[in-house]
C-alpha cells in the first residue's frame, strides 16, 4: 500500500477523530486541521461529503457500517488502519459523532497498540448532544435530571449478554429506567424489543419518546410520541440515521437551524483558523 504523500516516511500514526453528528459546521477545528494534513482517511459511511472534502491531499478509504446494508468487518478495518500507518504518514480514522461513543473504538485502539502504532483520540460532538441542542432541551437540569444515559439495545451475538449465549440483554434498559430516560442509539431496528423491555421494567407508557433523524443536517426531522405508542420511523425516514430521546418532552421543538446556511463569514473564520 503506497501513498505519494507518504513516500519514504517511517511508520505513521493514527488519530481516531470524531466527525460530529453530520453537519460540517459542527466539526471541531482540530478535526478539520487533521483532515487537511492527513495522508489517509479511513471513514465511516455516514460521514458527509462536505467533511471528506476537507481532506484535500488524502487517500479516502470507506469502511461503512450501516444496519441492513453491507458492512466492513471490524477485523478488516483494524488491518486497514495498521497497513496505512505502516505505509507512513498521518492516518485519520474518521468516525461519526464521537469516536468513543458506540463506535467500536476499543477494538481499533487495541489492534493499533498491539501493532506498535502510535494512536491518539480527538473527540467530536456526539449525536445525543446535537439532538438535544436541536430541540433546545437540556440534557441535565438542576433538581430534575442529574444523570445522562447513553444506551443502545444492540448486542453482538458473541457477547455474554446476548440471549443466544444464555444471558440477558437488558442492562441498557435498566439504566434507562433508573434514570427515567436517556438517549438511545441504533434503536430504529429494535423498536418492538426496546418498547417491550422498557415497559416490562416499569418505565411508564406515557414517557415522552422523540425520534430525531438526520441530526444537524438539512433533512433533520423530529417525530414526537410516547413510549407506549412508540413505532418505527415513518416510511419517509426509513433507513435514515436517527436517535431516540426518552423522557425528553419536546411538544414544540425550537426552530431547526439550517446548518448548511450558517453564513460565509463563519466559514471564513473557521478556514482561517484551520490554516493557522
Language-model segments: residues:
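Class I S-adenosyl-L-methionine
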Residues: 1-125, 130, 229-231, 237
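Residue-level signal for well-ordered alpha-helical positions
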Residues: 54, 134-135, 197
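Generic structural hydrophobic/aromatic packing signal, biased to beta-strands
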Residues: 17, 60, 81, 150-151, ...
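A contiguous loop/helix-start segment that scaffolds small-molecule binding in enzyme catalytic cores
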Residues: 2-4, 10-14, 86-91, 104, ...
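Short, basic, helix/turn surface patches
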Residues: 69-75, 142-159, 235-242
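Class I SAM-dependent methyltransferase SAM-binding "motif I" and its flanking Rossmann-like core
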Residues: 3, 96-179, 221-225
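Short hydrophobic/aromatic-enriched beta-strand-loop microsegments
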Residues: 59-65, 118-120, 139-146, 202-211
Amino acid at each position: 500500500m503506497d501513498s505519494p504523500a507518504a513516500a519514504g516516511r517511517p511508520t505513521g500514526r493514527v488519530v481516531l477523530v470524531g466527525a460530529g453528528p453530520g453537519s460540517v459546521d459542527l466539526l471541531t477545528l482540530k478535526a478539520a486541521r487533521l483532515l487537511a494534513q492527513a495522508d489517509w482517511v479511513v471513514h465511516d459511511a455516514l460521514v458527509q461529503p462536505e467533511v471528506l472534502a476537507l481532506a484535500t491531499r488524502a487517500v479516502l478509504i470507506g469502511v461503512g457500517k450501516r444496519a441492513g446494508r453491507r458492512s466492513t468487518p471490524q477485523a478488516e478495518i483494524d488491518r486497514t488502519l495498521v497497513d496505512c500507518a505502516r505505509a507512513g504518514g498521518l492516518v485519520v480514522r474518521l468516525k461519526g459523532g464521537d469516536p468513543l461513543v458506540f463506535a467500536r473504538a476499543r477494538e481499533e485502539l487495541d489492534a493499533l497498540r498491539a501493532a506498535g502504532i502510535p494512536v491518539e483520540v480527538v473527540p467530536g460532538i456526539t449525536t445525543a448532544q446535537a439532538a438535544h441542542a436541536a430541540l433546545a432541551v437540556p440534557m441535565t437540569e438542576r433538581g430534575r435530571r442529574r444523570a445522562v444515559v447513553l444506551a443502545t439495545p444492540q448486542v453482538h451475538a458473541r457477547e455474554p449478554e446476548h440471549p443466544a449465549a444464555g444471558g440477558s440483554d437488558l442492562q441498557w434498559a435498566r439504566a434507562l429506567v433508573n434514570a427515567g430516560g436517556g438517549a438511545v442509539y441504533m434503536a430504529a431496528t429494535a423498536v418492538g424489543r426496546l418498547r417491550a423491555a422498557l415497559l416490562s421494567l416499569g418505565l411508564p407508557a406515557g414517557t415522552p419518546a422523540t425520534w430525531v433523524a438526520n441530526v444537524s443536517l438539512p433533512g433533520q426531522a423530529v417525530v414526537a410520541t410516547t413510549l407506549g405508542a412508540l413505532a418505527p420511523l415513518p416510511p419517509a425516514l426509513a433507513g435514515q440515521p436517527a436517535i431516540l430521546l426518552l423522557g425528553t418532552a419536546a411538544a414544540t421543538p425550537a426552530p431547526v437551524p439550517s446548518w448548511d446556511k450558517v453564513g460565509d463569514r463563519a466559514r471564513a473564520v473557521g478556514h482561517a483558523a484551520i490554516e493557522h
